[in-house]
Design a protein with these regions (language model features):
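A glycine/threonine-rich phosphate-anchoring loop and its flanking beta-alpha core
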Residues: 69-171
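Glycine/serine-rich anion-binding loops at beta->alpha junctions
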Residues: 48-64, 97-103, 237
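Alpha-helix N-cap/loop-to-helix initiation residues
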Residues: 2-3, 32, 59, 101, ...
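ATP/NTP phosphate-donor binding region
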Residues: 1-50
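Alpha-helix C-terminal capping segments
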Residues: 45, 63-71, 86, 217, ...
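Active-site segments that bind and position negatively charged phosphate/pyrophosphate groups
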Residues: 161, 165-244
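Short Gly/Thr/Asp-enriched flexible loops that form oxyanion-binding sites at enzyme active sites
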Residues: 10, 38-40, 59-72, 105-106
């Protein structure tokens, strides 16, 4: 974001409104618990009132974990292993730069504990972002590989809600089928033409709709494939989520 001008645009806009900013960089793919803990220390020290996540799923999920951890007097990892439930979180906003995880509209937060090599997530509406700014032009520079990984993640979020045997209903299935068809068509376009606005816009919307609850309405979800992938990228953190 510092090479494409987005960083400067954001900072100048915030400065123009008199908003003080504290930065936290260093987010990696398969976001790490150690950075979450550093972020919690930072937001407490600086008395941060809101978190603006600029990036993709790793940045957003890190922000969600920090937002919950701000109010926790215990190890924030306990949220991810389901020993504690978050009851309060700092407000979160998003400026999205890649179409993939759908974290910009989801209630999901997945973090990797690099010491134990465990990758685990929790779902709670308290971490659903208040807003997401979604400009498809910000994804024009995303590589073919990362675009492909994103497409796989979007499709798996949808398929794991579609291929269930409890609570299926015609409208929900139609949502899934329409989204999958649109993603496959848009994917073929943007792989060959990364700057195709309509294709990128379709993927960006599909990323959000695949994981905001719409495609799973009324059905029971297990997310077995995602759990298998978490084992892979938890052990080998160089594996991109979509590739895993």
């Amino acid at each position: 974001i510092k090479t494409n001008g987005l960083y400067d645009k954001i900072m100048s806009s915030l400065k123009a409104e008199g908003i003080e900013v504290v930065e936290l960089g260093g987010v990696e793919s398969n976001p790490k618990l150690s950075l979450v803990k550093s972020g919690i220390e930072l937001v407490r020290k600086e008395k941060v009132e809101m978190i603006l996540a600029v990036g993709g799923g790793s940045v957003i999920d890190s922000s969600k974990a920090i937002a919950c951890g701000y109010y926790a007097d215990f190890d924030p990892w306990l949220f991810n292993i389901h020993e504690k439930n978050p009851t309060k979180a700092l407000p979160i906003g998003v400026i999205l730069t890649i179409s993939a995880a759908g974290s910009e509209l989801s209630n999901s937060c997945v973090i990797t504990n690099e010491e134990t090599k465990v990758k685990s997530g929790f779902n709670n509406d308290i971490v659903r972002p208040l807003f997401s700014i979604m400009d498809p032009t910000l994804t024009f520079s995303v590589s073919k590989f990362q675009t492909g990984c994103g497409i796989v993640d979007i499709m798996m979020h949808t398929l794991e809600r579609y291929l269930v045997d409890e609570g299926r209903n015609e409208l929900q299935l139609s949502f899934c089928e329409g989204l999958l068809h649109s993603v496959m068509e848009a994917g073929k376009v943007v792989i060959n033409n990364p700057s195709d606005y309509e294709g990128r816009a379709t993927l960006m919307l599909a990323s959000s709709f695949s994981h905001n609850g719409l495609t799973g309405i009324g059905s029971k979800m297990y997310f077995t494939v995602h759990k298998i992938e978490h084992e892979i990228s938890g052990m080998f953190d160089y594996v991109a989520h979509g590739a895993g």
